[in-house]
Every structure is written in structure tokens, then in C-alpha cells.
Amino acid sequence: MKLAKFLSLTILLSVGSYSFAQTAEVYGTITDAVTHEALIAMVRAGDKGASADLEGKYSITMPEGTYTFEVKYIGYATIQKSITLKAGESLLWDIAMEPMSNDFRVVVISAGKYEQDAGEVTVSMEVIKPKLFEDKNIASVEEGLQQAPGVAIVDDEPQIRSGSGYSFGAGSRVQVLIDDLPVLSGDAGKPSWGFLPMENISQVEIIKGASSVLYGSSALSGVINFRTAYPTLTPTVKLQAWQGMYSNPADKAARYWGRNNLKSGLNFLYSKQYGNVDLVLGTSLQADEGHLGPVKDSLGNFDTGAFNPMNVTRYDGENRARVSMNLRVRSKKIKGLNYGVNGIFSQGTSYATLIWENDSTGLYSAYEGSATKTIQTLTTLDPFAIYYGKKGAKHSLRTRWQSLDNNNDNNQGNFSDVLYGEYQYQQDWASLGVEHFITTAGVVVVDTKARGELFTGGNPDGRNTAGNRAIFLQLDKKFFNRLNISAGVRYEEFNINSETQGKPVFRAGANYKVGKATFFRASYGEGFRFPSIAEKFIVTSLGAVKVYANPDIKAETSYNAELGIKQGFKIGSVMGFADVAVFQQEFKNFIEFTFGQWNPNPTFDNMLGLGFKSVNTGGARVRGVDFSLMGEAKWNKSSVQFLAGYTYTQPISTTPDQVYATAPVNASNPFLLRDFANATFASTSSDPTNNILKYRLQHLIRVDVGATFGSWSIGASVRANSHMQNIDGAFETLEKEFPSIFNPGIIRWRAEHKKGDFVIDARFGYNINAQHKVAIVASNILNRVYAIRPLALEDSRLVLVQYSFSLHP
């Protein structure tokens, strides 16, 4: 028996030794040839493959023989090398990959939660590079988003392809993310743009169309994802400071104050790799008096002092301080593991003005009760851990604590705490023998606690809770090295206080590469948006106009379908992409902020019960075409970059005559207003011609061109918006029927401004040397007086002097 065991062990060891002797190992590190930064590239040979870890290290074991090794990474030139391996050999091969400097490539992550060439994604996307933000001296990201094709910012609320209108800050159909984590407030679903770290943006990715499968409820019309930059071995230091002045109103009668309003600020960034530790530190300081006049007291008095960056005295003024930190550790003990924490702290004071005083002498002042002063404190902490396995697996755990405190001066404050957690498992099956196949699965848990004087419609003490649970799965497969297929499903469940609702949503898409740089795509995606705490329970007032709660409001659903083509081109030294898409988005239970007689006990004290409320208004549809063009041209020491787009939409109500709400007033009540007894799309619109939805801009033109000639740089931007045909008819009705209570001149303004808006910006800069640059940046150089949303004036001409210092690889 002992002899048999001995012989068996000897045979096993012999076989194992023989097997080991027949194989060989190739190992090494993959880096960027220019920056020496580690790259998570894929190495393939024969039917085997291996992915590098976060430090760029890889290892692949092969039988003896001669193989062609291929190394690929998006944005870098593919490397091929023939290697002959001998049995038992261990070969070191360090790989330095060259960036594709001779090709125009755009790499995105948002479309499928993994890196893809922008031409191969199945949805419509726009990408904005940070250079545009820096050159235009954009201090808050919403200013830069206005330059993106197909995107409009209406009073700080994002619209993508007319998928949303204006909700007075309650609810959003566009999900806003930073590094895939949502940043919309937990109570109102509203973005705080000044919180986002402008100083460390690597690029902005905009998905157009329903994206609820990957990004949840608020992605009904699209996603805006801000991606931050990782540090390199060489430190990066950036400093940008500016001082500017607004032009006075063109109409002297509207100017009731003396000196010009001013704006100043500073951004700073430091980032570096320290061994296995990545560190990013950023800060931003800004003081902006805005373009409106000084705040008046009850007697009409206002501040006449000099500019004080610590004090907010204008109706559009803001001061803000922000610090941010990104810390990532690449584990030395566990290969492939990295973990860390990101954090942002922001505090600022601002005035928000909803309605101007009147359309002549009061354009730059506020209607009584419509200006709110807010001291906002916003904090986020984002612990995370990511593990890259040997067989193409990626496990990621991302969490966030977000605390938002809006301390308002009119007893309308609110506070919310959000806890967010997402576990995601992603598998690249190439190392397991299935080429070009990636699966992504995840679980999401969100809990929100909110309290505030604004949200007493649910509980008298203003305390409300909300929760969200979701699971999702996405499959991405490439066939024949030309056809990309993507499909996904998500089940999402929401609860607010005691109400719970869940629903599955689906998406599918295909992208076919016809030629070297021609890509056809088709996609279908469903959306599901549960109302926010604000939409259900807000109780407040806008001067004399009340806002009412609607605890019975239902979730809205949608689908988005589109066909598109992206064409890459190279004409001499000019390279870029042209993209055209036709699309349709259909909504059910469409939520709109609607004016009506909502108080069951109307009196003169509550303005006959008139006010606004979020209600389900039936069906809606948006059809349109979207064209965009982006690219660059380079020769010698000169270059030109361009981004342009045109979007046409036809946003309509599909149920214009449906009575979607009735006034809760007894029919015998003498104060029942018959015009508001039954609410329909047509009856609540200022101009229901062709059933065009409210607060939509049907034509958008966006152009930005920047050129560099040696040390000099110039640039110009154009934004053109068509006339906003339809708004809430109540504004005009109130002005007609109750001029002593509400008379801002909206009827006259809209009659005189029917041609849309055309705004031009310009910039001119000089590089003193490789580190120092000075520039003059001007926005609205024609000093046009215009309002995208009626009753809210847009910025006057602003001229800034900018200084930039940059030290980076």
C-alpha cells in the first residue's frame, strides 16, 4: 500500500513537472510611452489573453512555440510582436504604448460603464473637453453645458432635446453624475452646479435619450457625466485667476444703481502619484455680483458701497468656496485592488430671482417676494474599492454620503442626507475564450432623509424619507469586429414615506461599422421616473402666488428610439466626426408644474386658491433631428478645434384636450373660477398652437471655434435659441385679470421678443511661456437683453481678464 502511494505521488509530480516544463511565461509592465503612466491594457496571443492590473503589470502563460502577441488599449496604437517561447522560459517584456497622435479619437465610459471608442457606442453622445471650459473661463459647469449641441440650460435646469421643460427647481429628467455617482439633491432632484470641481474635469460626457437602465430614475431624457482626472507620476499644478466687469444695461431707464457689477475668482489644482498613492487636491473661490441690480429693502433702499467679495448684495449675486480631494491607494498586498475616498465641501451665499419686477424700469430688479437668499452648505464623502481579477473580472463598490443644507431667508429652508451605495461586477470574457464580450451587473441602494419648511405637504413637521433599490444587467458584444450589440435590463423600486412602486425597464442598441470610419446605430431605451419629495410635498409661495403639494402624483414613464450615423473624416490636416440622429421620445403620465385653482377653500387672502402644483398631464411626444460636428486641425505650431451642432425638436402633447385635473372647489362656491375648473393642456397654455409643450426651445444652434497660432490663441462661440412659443398661460391670465397683484409685463415682453436669441462670446489669449498665460474673455459681446425663460433675464456682457499657470506632464 505504501509503495502504491509512493508510486502515485511520483507519477503525479512527474506529470506536473513535465506539464510545467512545456509552458512559458511572458510578464512585464505596460505604460504610456510619454507620461510613463500605467495602462490597464489587454495582451493577447493565440486563444489566450490577460489584462494588466492598475499598476500596468501583466502575466500570460503559453505552451512553447512561436506566437504573435497583440497589445491593445483605446486611444493608443496597437502593438504586435512575434515571440518564440521555449519550455520553462520566463520572459520579461515591458511595453510602452504610443498615444494615437495621428488620429482623432474620443474615448467614453458613460455609454456602457466601460471604455469605448465614441464611434462604436449605440447611443447619441456629446463630449466636451476641459480646454473649452478653461479657454472660456467657465467658473460653473452649467455655463459650459450651454455650448453642448442639443443641450439648453433654462434657469439652471438642464434640457436635452426638449425632453423637459421648466419645473421651478423640483425634479429633473436629466441625471447629473460625477464619476458615475449621482449629484442631484435627495429632496428636490436638483443639481447644485457650483459644487462640481471645475478645476479637475477630464471631460464631460452627455448621453442623449433615456438611460434609466444604467443610471436610474432621473435619466429619463439623458445623462450628464463629469469625469475627473487621475494624477500621473509627474505632478500637475494648475492655477487660474480672473477679474471681470459686467456692462451696464443698454436701457438707462432700467439701471437704478451706480457702478458696474464685478466678478472675481480663483481655481487651484494639485495632483500627483506618490508611489502607490494617488492624490488630487483642488480649491475654488468665487465672488460674483451677477448682472442684476442691488437688493432693495421695503423702502426701496439698496447697497451703494464698493465691491465686497464677502457680501452678497445683488439679486443675482453669489459667493462660493469649495475644496475637493481625491485619494486612491493601489494595494501592495492584494494585486489588482485599489481603494480610497473622494470628498467635496462647498459653501456659498446666493440670491435667486424668479420673476423680474417689470419689463421696463424693473428688468434688473425682483418682483416682491420672488427673490430668495440662500446660504448653502454641501458635503460629499465617497469611499470606494475596486478589484481587478486575473480573468478579466472587475468588482467595484462605490458609496456616497451627501449632505445638503439650504438655509433660506424666507422660511423656505430645506435639509437632506443621502446615502448611496452601488456594487458592480463587470466581466471581460476575452481571457476566458470569448472575444469582445462584456457583461455588467449591479445593485444600487439609496436612502434619503429630508426635512424642511418647504416640504410640509407630507408631514406637518416637514420630515420625509425616500428610498430606492435597483438591480441591473447589461450585455455588450462585438461580432465580426464590426457589429456592436448592447442590451440591458433594470428593475427599480422606489418609496417615499409609506408609498412604494417598482418597475422594470429595458434597453437595446446596435452599432455597425460600415467602412473605416462610418458607424450606423440604432437604439431603444425605456425610462421610469418616480416623483421627488419636492414634487409631492412642497408647500411654499412665490410672492403672492402659492405652490401646492400633490401627494397623489404618479411616476412618469417613457421610451426613446433613434437612428443615427457617425462619420469620421480626415481632409488634409483636418480630422473629426460628423453625427446625425433622428429620434422620438414618448411619455406617459407626463409631470408638469401647472397653474390652477388648487386650494379647496379659495379666499381673497390666498389669492382665490390660485397657484402651481406638479401634476400628471397625460401623454407627450418629442420628435426631432440632431446634428453635431467636432474635430481639430493641426499644422506646425498652429491648431484649430471646433464643436458645432443644430437640433430641431417637435415636442407636443398627445392628449391636449384630456382633463387631467379638476379644481377641488365645491361647484356652489362663489369663488370657483370656471376657467380653472378643468385643467387640460390647451386650457393651461399661453399658446397651444400645434400642441407644442411649454418651456421648449425647438431650434438650437451651438458653435465654438478656437485657434492657436504659436503663442497666440483666439476663439468665438455662438448660441442661438428659437422663441419659446408656449409657457404657462396663467402668467398672462394673472396679468390681465389681476394687474394690481401681478403685473410684470410678460405679455408685452413676449409680444416684442418673438425672434429668438443670438448670443456671441469671444476670447483672446497669449502664452507668455509654457507655464504662464493671460487672456481676455468676453461673453454676450453684443450686450443683448434677452430671457430664455420669460421673467428671468440672462447675463449682460461680461469682460474678464484671466491669468493661468499650468505645470503638468
What are these regions (language model features)?
Residues 396-406, 513, 521, 554-611, ...:
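Membrane-embedded beta-barrel scaffold of Gram-negative outer-membrane proteins
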Residues 92-95, 141-144, 159-161, 174-177, ...:
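N-terminal periplasmic accessory domains that precede
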